[in-house]
Amino acid sequence: MTFTFTALLCLGLTLRLWIPVLTGSLPKPILRVQPDSVVSMGTKVTFVCEETIGVKESHLYRNGNLQRTVLKNHQKPTNKTEFSFSNVDQQMQQYQCSYRTQTKSSDYSEPLELVVTGAYSKPSLSAQTNPVVTSGGYVTLKCEPSQDNHTLILTVEGSQKHSWRKDPECNRYTEKCHALFYVGPLTSNQRWIFRCYSYEKHTPQVWSAPSEPVELLVSGKLQKTTIKAEPGSVIRSGRAMTIWCQGDLDAEIYFLHKEGSHNTQSTQTLQQPGNKAKFLIPSVTQRHAGQYRCYCYSSAGWSEPSDTLELVVTGIYYYGVKLSGLPSPVVPEGGNVTLHCTSHSNYDKFILTKEDQKFTSSLDAEYIPSTGQHQALFVMGPMTPNYSGTFRCYGYYKHTPQLWSVPSELLKIFISGPSRKPSLLSHQGHILEPGMSLTLQCYSDTKYDKFALYKEGGTDIIESFSQWTKAGLSMTNFTLSVMPNSTVHSGENVTLMCWSTYSVDTFILSKEGSGQPPLRLKSKIQDQQYQSEFSMSGVTSKLSGTYRCYGSHDSSLYLKALIGVSVAFLLFLFILIFILLRRRHQEKFRKDDEDAQKGKELQLSTGAAEPVTRDRGHQKRSNPAAATQEESLYASVEDMETKDGVELDTWKPPEGDPQGETYAQVEPSRLRRAGAISPVVSREQLNTKYEQAEEGQEVDSQATESEEPQDVTYAQLCSRTLRQGTAAPPLSQAGEAPEEPSVYAALATARPGAVPKNKKQ
């Protein structure tokens, strides 16, 4: 009976599947795609056409055209057919499938759009508000395309896919476009990861590359996570630190979020469920400063946010801060102490921290005009042993409360209690020579672990572990060495230490007045400062003197500056040399032109066969001394003619010639020096020889004397000065130069007025 019922049931189910075929109505197939309907270019995709059993062949269409046909195997009937493509392109793609039985064909499936991404550059996506929302809240996301005239689409990852499309709005002034998507409500039972794409309107299946993902953190109701920083929340710039988040045992992923940021700071996905995640920052910078919270997500949903971790970065400002204890860093129990924090920088606030970071206090800075410093006074008391410890002071500005200055020097506060006081003695006496080493011994019959040595009025306290003696005493020795004393005995060793609270790469130690090159050492960071130690062993008198220490940054920067200065100096030197050479060249050409002009004038004067005239103009002499000079000149020329037997052949200019120069050739004779010429010729004789001279003009003459006797001498009477020179002799008609040069004296007349014959000299 049971077997019969089972057989009838199977027969009924089989007939049910074949009823549509027999009646002529084939069911419409369903088309799906794997891995997703949105894939990047070059991705392998597989289309799955779900159909009925007994299909003879299946067909896949792309954009209405038959793409592929698959013949079915009747021996292994299935209700699915797969079509695989190894490399999809960026063409517009819309797919459908259908199937055919022995007698009929089915209808087409519903269209399936395959979207290909990566055709354009990616847009940018950001959250306009805090990406951390409560369950049921809304968030505004801003998408900016990288291409103009593109439509924007916002998608969310996950099993329930949603998308939003918008045309961007453009600012005509900035020419930037964007679209705002208001998404929600957001629930705490899933992750919300958004991406943005852009596409052209005529190709809606071809998208750009996806934007960077933006994940919204939903504050849930699961157990709150915890957060802590190692080595601490106050850390110096450039050092490494680790932030730990701890939550539920089933947590799959942890999120670290910085308050005020529009994106998730960091994400840590666990390989296996656990309750702790590690976020490492290799080198802390000022951008890491701020407030942080942790979240975790599991299959049950989101956790509550952790408490706030405030990360402070120190060493951002290099202006030093000084900390001191008033009246003394050693305070009796129950007493008060004032910690004085000062700086020359105009910080808005000072903050005092304890080494274990269990104590922090901040005060507004106060300006002191008398010292030109800013200060803050931290009053502590009544003092208890809990207040003892090491303190530091920092300065910062109000607009950046998580960015602090370099720290002050450590200040240790001691609380003197009711225990028995120790004893202090010196075996070397109380009077010492300068530079000697001093050993102070501190001891007590109480079993103390440490002793501290303090100088009255000072700020430095030296600590040392105690030793136990057989007599039951605890004791220790404090040795005050030569360092930092500047008095050293010959043969001893000394160490000079250069240090700075500012960043220094290399320290340079130089001795004043020494010709030796300075010493250089790379700096080392110790006790929150940069320092280098220059050791000298077996010092002698040659090493005595005054030393100075300098700090420098990377030498390559100074090398570049030195090269730049050298190049500029050489360029300036080349330009200066060029200007000097050019000026010298111009002066040489100017001198050559002047010499050529003078030679041309000399050739014209010596080679003229006819009188050569020059327009000197009429010059009148009203000075009696000038008239006397004229008489001497006339007398000198006449004396040359009468005493030395020199014959003058004169050429007078034509009557119409406006120029009054006359050239006279002197027959071969010896020309006497000017001192041998006797001015005894009367004005009447000169006036008789030059009857055509006009009144009111002066006559100047210049005699030229050659060291060697000359055969031919020219004399020109000039109206100004007596010139002397040697002219190049004119060429003969045959082109040959005369055998000897000629010496001439230009005696040019300026047509003086007639001298009365009856005038006495």
UniProtKB/Swiss-Prot annotation:
Comp. bias (Basic and acidic residues): 589-601
Residues annotated as domain Ig-like C2-type: 25-116, 117-219, 223-314, 322-415, 480-559
PANTHER family: LEUKOCYTE IMMUNOGLOBULIN-LIKE RECEPTOR SUBFAMILY A MEMBER 5 (PTHR11738:SF179), MHC CLASS I NK CELL RECEPTOR (PTHR11738)
Residues spanning the signal sequence: 1-24
Protein name as annotated: Leukocyte immunoglobulin-like receptor subfamily B member 3-like
Membrane topology: Single-pass membrane protein
GO biological process, one term: cytokine-mediated signaling pathway
Keywords assigned by UniProt, alphabetized: Cell membrane, Disulfide bond, Glycoprotein, Immunoglobulin domain, Membrane, Repeat, Signal, Transmembrane, Transmembrane helix
Positions glycosylated per UniProt: 79, 149, 336, 477, 493
TM spans (from-to): 561-581
Region annotated Disordered, chain positions: 589-634, 647-668, 684-761
Gene Ontology CC annotations of this record: plasma membrane
Extracellular side: 25-560
Coiled-coil stretches noted in the UniProt entry, renumbered to this chain: none
Intervals of motif ITIM motif 3: 742-747
Motif stretch (ITIM motif 2): 712-717
Segments on the Cytoplasmic face: 582-761
Pfam families named among the record's database cross-references: ig, Ig_2
Family matches, as CDD domains: IgC2_D1_D2_LILR_KIR_like
Gene Ontology MF, one: inhibitory MHC class I receptor activity
Disulphide linkage map: 49-97, 143-196, 245-294, 341-393, 498-549
Domain notes: Contains 3 copies of a cytoplasmic motif that is referred to as the immunoreceptor tyrosine-based inhibitor motif (ITIM). This motif is involved in modulation of cellular responses. The phosphorylated ITIM motif can bind the SH2 domain of several SH2-containing phosphatases, including PTPN6/SHP-1, resulting in the dephosphorylation of the downstream protein kinases SYK and BTK.
Motif (ITIM motif 1): 632-637
